[in-house]
């Protein structure tokens, strides 16, 4: 009888420990969420300026993400309304995330995303944090990619500001190239030190 009681307590203790370990692991990355919608065939961010720890002043507007000093984050972008009424359009899908404008005080031109003109040292910081797939365009490797959700990782080793550009495509029923839309707020990294 004592053995059964001890075994039961040990099992309950192990389950509690495993639950705590899973909960700690799940929250260790401090997930950030940005919500987007298609409004009149344009990609619009509906998250508030303060949803992801950005201050009201100098935040870069809706969709701004601040990762505090010493934190790491997974950034998830969700597309809520994906209706496409453009020529032969079917629906919008999230396609990619690009970074650019290293420490730029203003939003870079959409065609100027990437790190082709960024110093190697500064590019290395961004690449270590975000895992860049293509330096020239700033394309980021995703940790999750679905039709209405895309996720990227941010290790936040260094302090800097970088802008991100979300790409949504509207596939066409006629087989022609898809329609492409972008939205581009910023990420403010607090760094590890």
Language-model features: locations:
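N-terminal edge beta-strand
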Residues: 30-69
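Signal peptide cleavage region of secreted peptide precursors
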Residues: 26-27
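Extended low-complexity, serine/threonine- and proline-enriched intrinsically disordered segments
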Residues: 74, 86-120
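Beta-strand cores of secreted/periplasmic/IMS beta-sandwich domains, seen most often
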Residues: 65-88
């Amino acid at each position: 009888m004592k053995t059964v009681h001890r075994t039961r307590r040990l099992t309950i203790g192990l389950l509690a420990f495993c639950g705590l370990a899973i909960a700690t692991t799940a929250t260790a990355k401090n997930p950030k969420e940005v919500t987007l919608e298609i409004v009149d065939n344009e990609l619009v961010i509906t998250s508030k300026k303060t949803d992801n720890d950005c201050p009201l002043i100098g935040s870069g507007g809706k969709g701004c993400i601040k990762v505090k000093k010493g934190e790491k984050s997974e950034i998830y972008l969700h597309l809520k309304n994906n209706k496409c009424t453009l020529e032969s359009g079917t629906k919008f899908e999230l396609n990619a995330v690009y970074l650019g404008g290293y420490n730029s005080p203003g939003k870079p031109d959409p065609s100027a995303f990437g790190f082709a003109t960024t110093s190697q040292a500064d590019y290395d910081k961004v690449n270590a944090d975000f895992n860049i797939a293509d330096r020239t365009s700033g394309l980021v490797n995703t940790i999750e990619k679905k039709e209405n959700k895309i996720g990227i990782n941010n290790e936040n080793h260094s302090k800097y500001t970088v802008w991100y550009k979300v790409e949504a495509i509207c596939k066409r029923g006629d087989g022609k190239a898809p329609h492409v839309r972008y939205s581009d707020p910023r990420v403010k990294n607090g760094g590890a030190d």
